A protein has these predicted regions:
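Short, surface-exposed loop/turn microsegments at beta-strand edges and helix-strand junctions
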Residues: 85-93, 102-105, 109-111, 123-125, ...
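Non-catalytic DNA-recognition/assembly elements of restriction-modification systems
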Residues: 1-82, 210-320, 451-490
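A short beta-sheet element
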Residues: 134-173, 335, 360-362, 371-413
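Sequence-specific dsDNA recognition surfaces
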Residues: 63-84, 99-127, 303-321, 337-367
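A short glycine-rich beta-alpha junction/loop motif
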Residues: 151-158, 190-212, 390-398, 428-453
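Well-ordered mid-protein domain cores that form the structural environment of catalytic cofactors
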Residues: 101, 105-107, 116-119, 131-141, ...
């Protein structure tokens, strides 16, 4: 009896492992201390930023400053500010925001009227230009390739051109590196910059690497963006094949059955038998019926996402307490805003140990899957490339598990305006829009009469994703060269 008492048993105590982290330090001049109110707390000074500046200044190749007369930059500017007059799609020019700058294939959400008092030519992006955000989340980097060329971006984006073409990809890679990001978003004293101006680039040091290293890095970035452009062209080709096969008109040209066409708001009748338990008008919009009727006319079969031929499951992770860790101990944690980026900018990493089961079951991104928001801005669909596999998604995202033979085709259809409309019809909620897996299962999907065309669409989407994966690997290779052969080279 006594021996069975837990109080008398030896209990093996697990000694916690203490992570051995290097001490963060830097030297601070007396003038810096006085300038910051004579405060001596380390938090007042960004130690990592000061170390980043010192690392670059002391690199083996010496430095140049980006924007001086002897620097790399030819011109850095942003258009003048103007009052934006927004309008509908058919009456304006597609207008992109800084948050879309890093998307693999940005799609415009806003359109500005042609009567807006601004120079559209000045707002249009020119090829071979480096882009920097100057306010909000400063320091975001992008490169104008074929996809972004001639698009109209806001005045919140700084446009940078270079004297030598080789310096464009080289500077892009440096500023995107962890050291470059620290330097771009702070000054030499380690103070965080809240607003970036072109003049600030004059003070930024960059390693003066040999031309052959610059050329290697620049070529990798050029090839990376070429592959992104090619992937976008494949998506466009697949979409056009789908539109042609189903004889789909522009979504604005569908004839809808409005009750009173002259009414100031859209009005329509709904039969009691068609309510389906939904009394919200958005579920019964006539455009939805018009799209479905058109698909039934031209498709071989109209089924739903929940069809076992289309998907094996639709997963929405449950709410959970997140355990964040350093990069080396976790997996990337993606929210909705990072999904369209090739190299997501998230700095959050979920613990591999604490979330092992969840990563395996519901949080980890699976092959041949599609991702779509379950809360917030609904209707968008993402086809995650290979390097996303195994990363974690938030509990505000749903994962559609599909098959290699159909997942690309499924993405192409859902990525169209027609697919987005069919998803959004299931929206519910008051303050925050929401949608559930059961709703996604009911979204209509057409199967084509011509199976060869359907396979070609699927193959184009898969090939596009493969090109995006290769583009990601090339950029990572350029970043590795920058770190190992330039910044930290002995």
């Amino acid at each position: 009896m006594v021996n069975s008492n837990l109080a008398y048993q030896d209990i093996e105590i697990e000694i916690p492992q203490i992570k051995d982290e290097p001490v963060k330090w830097c030297s601070v001049s007396l003038s810096d201390v006085i300038a910051r109110g004579k405060r001596l707390e380390a938090s007042v000074f960004d130690v990592e930023a000061k170390q980043a500046w010192q690392t670059v200044i002391n690199n083996r190749f010496g430095i140049k400053y980006l924007g001086t007369s002897n620097g790399l930059i030819d011109n850095a500017y942003y258009p003048g500010r103007f009052k934006r007059i927004y309008c509908s799609k058919g009456n304006g020019v597609a207008f992109y925001l800084p948050s879309q700058m890093t998307d693999v294939y940005p799609k415009p959400d806003k359109y500005i009227s042609k009567i807006t008092k601004c120079s559209l030519d000045e707002l249009r992006l020119k090829a071979q230009t480096l882009l920097l955000t100057r306010s909000g989340t400063i320091g975001t980097i992008s490169y104008v390739s074929k996809t972004l060329e001639n698009t109209v971006f806001s005045d919140d984006v700084i446009r940078v051109t270079f004297k030598d073409a080789v310096d464009l990809g080289y500077t892009y890679t440096f500023l995107k590196s962890s050291i470059g990001q620290k330097i771009l978003t702070t000054n030499g004293y380690g103070s965080v910059i809240t607003h970036l101006e072109p003049e600030h680039l004059n003070e930024i040091p960059i390693p003066n690497a040999p031309t052959d290293i610059k050329q290697r890095i620049n070529n990798l970035i050029i090839d990376s963006y070429r592959l992104r452009d090619e992937s976008n062209e494949l998506i466009d080709s697949a979409t056009q094949l789908l539109v042609d096969e189903l004889h789909l008109p522009d979504i604005s040209e569908f004839e809808v059955d409005d009750y009173k066409k002259e009414a100031p708001v859209e009005t329509f009748n709904v039969k009691l038998s068609d309510l389906n338990g939904r009394a919200d008008a958005s579920y019964h919009l006539p455009i939805v019926d018009a799209i479905i009727n058109h698909l039934r006319k031209y498709a071989e079969e109209v089924t739903t996402v929940g069809d076992e031929r289309i998907s094996s499951d639709i997963i929405l992770p449950g709410r959970f307490k997140r355990v964040y860790v350093d990069k080396e101990y976790g997996v990337r944690f993606l929210g909705g805003k990072e999904l369209n980026q090739l190299d997501p900018s998230t700095e959050k990493y979920l613990s591999k140990k604490a979330h092992a089961n969840q990563l395996k079951d519901s949080l980890g991104i699976k092959p041949n899957s599609l991702l779509t928001p379950a809360r917030g801005s609904l209707g968008e669909v993402v086809f995650p490339p290979k390097h996303f596999i195994g990363w974690a998604i938030s509990d505000n995202l749903m994962q559609i598990l599909s098959f290699d033979s159909i997942c690309g085709y499924l993405y192409i259809f859902l990525n169209t305006e027609y697919g987005k409309t069919l998803i959004q019809r299931f929206t519910y909620g008051g303050v925050v829009d929401a949608i559930e897996p059961e709703h996604i299962k009911q979204v209509v999907i057409p199967l084509l009469k011509n199976e060869d065309v359907q396979k070609q669409i699927n193959d184009f989407a898969l090939e596009a994703n493969q090109k995006r994966y290769k583009a990601y690997k090339l950029e990572q290779q350029a970043l590795d060269i920058m770190d190992n052969e330039v910044i930290f080279a002995k």
